Amino acid sequence: AYFDWTNIGGLPVYASAGRRPSTGGAPLNFREDEPRGGTPLGSRINYQFDGITLGWHIREESTLRFCYGIGYESEWGNGSELKRPADRLDDASFYGLNWDVWDTDDMFIQATVARAKDVTDGFNGLVVIPVDPLTGQDAPAPAVLRFDPSVQVGDIDLASAVLIRHDGPFDWFISGNYMESDPTNETGVFGGLFTDPFDKPQSQDGHMYYAGIRYNVPNEKTKIGLEFNHGSKYWFNFALAEDDFLGAKTSVRGDVWEAYVTHRIRDRFVAKLDYINYQFDYSGSGWLLGAPKKLDNNPTLGFPTYDEASKWMLSISARF
């Protein structure tokens, strides 16, 4: 749930509070043949959280927004209530500026900077640990355990930009994304911020670039697309809303190729045939704890890790 307050004081400004529209942002909507869903770039944040937004409509084609949200609530409704107040973690918060620089029918340019502050070493819930993350051997305890975050591992800064164009029968985009970590000296059972357990955390940076093109068949229902993205050794984004069983492709530390065909059966009913090939260069894609390991060296890893994977998928989606 959320509410909006528009034209505050007769000015082109607005405020919004509640569940943030933070999933399915551009350019992820290309591959689904859907309108832009979330406000932030989907290549950087595809993640549900609650918070507030203050927006300013600079002009008809341009909007600037300040966003704040809570990514982890340390108080009510979790295991932290059983701890002494001095031992409880701070809330993990998101701050960000999102600027729709230019938004018209033919072109969309967006830039975003954000900080995730007081990031924890996990989440409240069940975790599956089939092997010991320190030794790589079979875990001596049950594989499914209850887990609560134990330390705050630091802050993560992100910046990204996207250019989207619609030229005749073709739609295309290019996106650049950057990440830098500011760790504390804390490490938990899974390690620190991009650091193995018992090692001293150091600041790291990573990047990801992402490009795609889509052809609109003259029947105005069928679209054929090709996308590529590459993530560096320490690349990390917040993409937990992705429902792909191999994980978010935008989180991969390596190369991803995707080819797809969508066909709009009705206005809100889309069929899709999709092929994705993943080439993982480093371990830990989509995970902020532990140091990435080069996968061509047969490293000792605490979790099963792909070095290459591919999938075919036929899906039908209905939007209400």
Give each language-model segment a name.
Residues 1-76, 96, 100-108, 206-240:
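Outer membrane beta-barrel
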Residues 39-45, 83-87, 150-151, 201, ...:
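Alpha-helix capping and helix-loop boundary segments enriched in small/acidic/polar residues
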Residues 44-45, 73, 80-100, 114-121:
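Loop-rich catalytic cores of soluble enzymes, especially ATP-dependent carboxylate-amine ligases
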Residues 46-51, 93-94, 98-100, 247-262:
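Outer-membrane beta-barrel signature, preferentially recognizing the C-terminal barrel domain
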Residues 47, 111, 191-195:
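Generic preference for hydrophobic/aromatic residues in regular secondary structure cores
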Residues 68, 111-113, 124-126:
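Extended catalytic-interface subdomain
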Residues 122-320:
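Outer-membrane beta-barrel pore domains
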